[in-house]
């Protein structure tokens, strides 16, 4: 399921699970020529979701209640995904009500901003991230998927079922 060794993940992030960001599908040029795109879009087999101009993050509330916010970027030091929950204490507090063993996928974004504005907050140390948010406004977390809830994982379920 994951390219990240569980023992290494547990060493750095007790109670967490870690996985790569899902790859998103799009039609190749050959497929576009073969199929009527409007028919594919309207056939009921696919759905779209709003894309915010931010950055992908997975929120993990571990089995022991530990909270993590993993980006899709890997640390050069550990080879694991970078963790940024301390940059967004308001989001950590808002998600505290979720049961242990929950994993959400979403996008951290600056309302009215772009992905560079998001990186200005999420790419720095926590104290600077909090300072920037106090000055410029808080980032939001747009949740678009739930891949685990209360210890039950849904990785093998399709998007419609989740």
Segments from the language model and where they lie:
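RNA/tRNA-interacting regions in translation and RNA-turnover enzymes
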Residues: 1-69
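Covalent nucleotidyltransferase
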Residues: 38-162
